[in-house]
Every structure is written in structure tokens, then in C-alpha cells.
């Protein structure tokens, strides 16, 4: 093992040789042997090996292996020095190997070391993006779980910081190709991260790019397979995939496949859905997603059939008035309760799809069914008016801090929901029914997004196909209030949210 003095002497030989460095192979071998010495010798070797690496291609493997030994040394200061110098080995055919090594080193728990690895990866990314991606994806596909996890997070956080001259169209195509391989077997959280990566690529910001992403999500959602409402993994996967798809839809990128699947497979099984997460109102969550997608549904093959399924489901939540005895009192039937949150979603979805078949209520339903529907609408509208007046009275004169209390936040949301339902019911009362009114769903930002405008992909905390529990989609901070799913009914029960309307 060489001493410190021998290392300096051989360094001097190489430094003084200028253009004839490659003739002093023995001197470079002495420096390589420095990795077997003590702490001081290793520190010097960590600096000297990369400095002359390019002059000895025949010793490339030995040099990289020597530096890798230092990257795994017990002494953290030696590891840091060795990692810092790794980009100097990233030349030609060695670069993918260096990228592979650096990706493996992401598993370190030392924060300073972790930052060095990140910086080194970014450094070689700028030298050769394709080669670096080769190393990263190699570990994502075949590496240890911790390495895979951190490599994916590296891509999801660092790609967006790279300039356009690094992320060329060819590089983005490689990212898409490799990502598709990974997406064949991913956890929920990984799926969400990859959607974040892909939706951020410049080449996928176009209409055709967004369409590619929607098809990718549809494949993950397994829309060709029958829906299994009792399987929490199946429910979870559909929820998370749909959450990822919703921000991609626009007037040019249609939600038709998803809306069709929801109408045909999910709505008929709504009451038997197994919730994948405790405390989640799974039925309301599904109806919210359907409502958001319905605005961007294109031409549907079985429109009348699916509209009828949606209509039938709406009827379940729009009760008939209770029968009255001769004296005008309740005849003993239980007073119906109005589930406003559900009705907002279903009525909005029906209103959106109904535009595509405007004579559905007048020509496709028989007179008796239409009369029944009008009675239900009228009863619901009567209850709405009572409740809207109560809410407005309760919120009258309240501003600033007063509106920030939990109770008042809930009332504000309830007012948005009931106002939306009121507008939609008025449309359907027209003769013939009208589908012209526009409302903003109660949980969405008040500020409208132009139909053709690009929307930013929503991020989620974790998600599924099919192994992870879902985290709800991140909502826009501009909205007034958005309580967790199911909170409307439970918390507003104290404020007669699901109102009994007998005698009103």
C-alpha cells in the first residue's frame, strides 16, 4: 500500500508529464492502490484518481471500481469526496455505468451525501441525458425498493429544473418509452409520481400528448375489464386513475371512455362499493369524479342507455313527497331526507350529458315517468328554497373572521351546493327542458377555466393502481372551503342539512 508521500510523488510524475501522461501507467496504478490505505491515503486517492482517469482508458474499469470502493467507505468524509468527483468518470461508454452507480447511492441516509449524489446526477444529466436516464431506469426496473423509490422521486422533482436544451424531444420520448415499461407494475404512489413526470414533459403538453396520457391512464384503470365493487383494490385503482385523468380532459381531449365506464359499470353498483380508505364517502367521491368528467364527454355510442342509467340513479336520490292522510297529516311514512351533495353531482352529470340528447325527457320517457320526475323536482325545489333561505339568514352580515369558523364554512359550501341544484332544476322545469345554464361545481374554484385552456395536473399525496390507499386529490386553494368527502351530511345534520321537508 502506498504512503501519502508515495501518492504525492506519483501525482507529481503524472502532473509534470503533460501530454505524455498516458505513458506513466505504473504511476497511475500506485494512485489506484491508494484506496487500500488509511484515511489520509484514501482522501488523496479520491481526488487523484478522477484527475487522470481520462488518460488511462485501459485502466477505466479498475479506476471506476476503486472510486466506487471509496464511495462505500465507512468514513463519511471520504464517501463525500469520492461522490463529488464521480462525474469526472462519466465519459463515453462509462457514463451509463456512473449514472447507475449514482442512482444506487441515492439510498444514503446522510443528507449532505444525498445532496452530493443529486448534484452529481444533475451534472451528468447535462452531459448526456439519454445515458443518465439509462442508468436511472435500469435501477428503477431492477434495483432495490429504496433505490427505485428515490430514483423515481429524483425524476419527479429534478426533471422540471432542467433546461430545454437538455430535455430535447428525443430525450422526452425516451422518458415516455421507459416510463411505460415501469407502469406495467407500479404502486399507487409510483403511478402518481410518473403521471407528474409525464404530464410535465413539454412534448406532452399538446392535445395529442394529453390524449396519449389519457390512454395511458385508461390502460392503468383497466377499463376493458368488468368492475368489481367489492374489491377495494379495484375501487382504489379506478379512483386514483380517474383522479389523474380528470386534469387532462378538455374540449379536445374527451372523457368519453371514463364516463361510459362509470355509467355502465360503476353507477349500477354504487351502493355496494367497498371503500378502500376508512372515513371516505366512496359514493360521493365517485359521483364527484363523474360530474367533473361529464363536462368533457364526447360522442357516446350508447348515449340513451347510459343517460337512462344516470337518470335512474338520480331518481334514487330525489324522493317523492310523503303521502298525506285526509287530515293533512303525515300518513305514517318516514319523512324523506334530501342528500344535496349526491344530487348536485348526479343532476350536474345528467344536465351535461342531457345536452347531447335534449329530447330525452320529452321523447324517450313515457308521460307517466316524466310526470313522476316533475313531481320529484318540484318537491326537491320546495325544500331547496326553504333551506337556501335558512342558510342566507344564518350567514347574513357575517364577513372576515366570522366566516372562517368551521360551522360557517360548512354553511357557505352548503349554499353553493343548493344554489347549483336550484339553477339546474329551473333548467329542467322549462318546456321543453333546457340545458343552457352553467354552474361551477361546489368544490371547484369559482374562477372559471376556459374550456380549451390547459389545466395544471393535480398532485396527490398517494394513490393506487392497485397497491396503495388513495389520498384525495389536492384541491385548489382559491376555493372557499372543501370539507373532506362525506362531511357535508354528517356535520350539517346539526343544521338540518339532510332536511326532512314534511310540512314545509
UniProtKB/Swiss-Prot annotation:
Entry keywords, A to Z: Acetylation, Apoptosis, Cytoplasm, Nucleus, Phosphoprotein, Repeat
Keyword Cell membrane in record: no
Modifications after synthesis and translation: Acetylation at Lys-251 impairs antiapoptotic function.
InterPro entries in the cross-refs: API5, ARM-like, ARM-type_fold
Listed GO MF terms: fibroblast growth factor binding
One record GO biological process: negative regulation of fibroblast apoptotic process
Chain segments annotated as transmembrane: none
UniProt biased composition (Low complexity): 461-472
Motif mapping: Nuclear localization signal: 454-475
Residues recorded as bearing Phosphothreonine in the entry: 399
Paired cysteines (S-S): none
Entry protein name: Apoptosis inhibitor 5
